[in-house]
Amino acid sequence: HSNGQVTAIDANYAKQLKVTGLSSLDAALRQTTIRTALPDTENEAMTMMTLKKGQTTADVYAKYSDEFISKFPTSAFGYKEKAAYLTDKAEYDAAAKLMEEGIKKSAAKDEAHSNYADLIYQKIIYKGDSVYKDWTLDKAIAEAQKAYEIKAQPIYRHQEAQINFVKGEYQKAYDTFMDLTNTSLLSGELYFEAAQAKKNLKAPAKEIEVLLDSAVSVGNKTGMVANYYLARGEFLKEQGEFRRAIQDYNMYDSIARPVSPAFFYTRYQCETKLRMWQPALLDIARTCYLAPKEPTYFAEWASLDLRVKRYDEGISAATHCIELAPEYADGYLLLGLLQKEKGNKEEAIKNLKKAQELGDSRAGEYLKKVK
């Protein structure tokens, strides 16, 4: 209404605003604050709901769920989405009733049972099972089994295996994961999950490694492999196989984006074990760059600089560590040791004393050496 005139919406403009599943991405529609109607075909409506999920508030999304249920009452999708909203609000009775209604009305009964299993499983993982006693892992398993009885899809057996894993039934979960590698569901993920089950069964390291090798091998064929290189690298690191771990970490680094500071820190730890100082310096620098407020990383950087006699760089890292955490003894201890190496005796004593005051038992021994 820029010039104070009220204008009627142009009829052609209204026609152009015809809703399709991808209209969520349309800038013109996003600028109108009115909640757009769902498309008239189920698939397009599901697409739009999926896109809307990250763009709207939970309450607005719940209204879409209601609209979806009224437009497509025989689709299992709407009931699941609305019940998830109710679960988040701790309205468990209402969520349970809605899922039961969905099972009665849905054309694809297998999907409805599987959705119910998933809702219970997610709720227990994130909120525990003490709240709302009717929802147990056993009930989730029963729902997944009903889905499989109606339609023998391997995905429903996979769901049951994942619930068994959370329940602590590791052998049962392992057996199913391995069975499923002979189905259309074959993926690196199945071998990775089987490896996790074996780990919890305290199996020999070699058995776990063979499963992780399979996860990498299958993952390479399907193009979904980064996380399996990372998982195998972490496993090899735990086994003290640092050189092989680094090879896997390097593969992960070459294909995964974005990479977290924790990753670079883990690889740095392996590199220092092998005295690979140059790559270790690069990785601890990357770690600190990506996590500029984490004092322990700067302490590690200062510590490595001390080891490789880069005293000025080390003093800079230790000083930054102290700025971030004035009560963290390691920063003062490292700064003192670096200053001692630089011949700055007075400052070294001052910082080592500060580390001692903050409870570092090593500082006293170093102080004797400076004096």
What function would you assign to each model-found segment?
Residues 67-68, 101-102, 146-147, 179-180, ...:
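Canonical positions in the second alpha-helix
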Residues 73, 107, 151-152, 185-186, ...:
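Short coil turns that delineate tetratricopeptide repeat
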Residues 337, 341-371:
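Terminal, low-structured helical/coil segments at or just beyond the last alpha-helical repeat
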Residues 9, 61, 95, 140, ...:
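Single-residue signature of alpha-solenoid repeat helices
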Residues 54, 88, 122-126, 166, ...:
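Register position in tetratricopeptide repeats
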Residues 26-27, 44, 78, 112, ...:
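TPR alpha-solenoid repeat register
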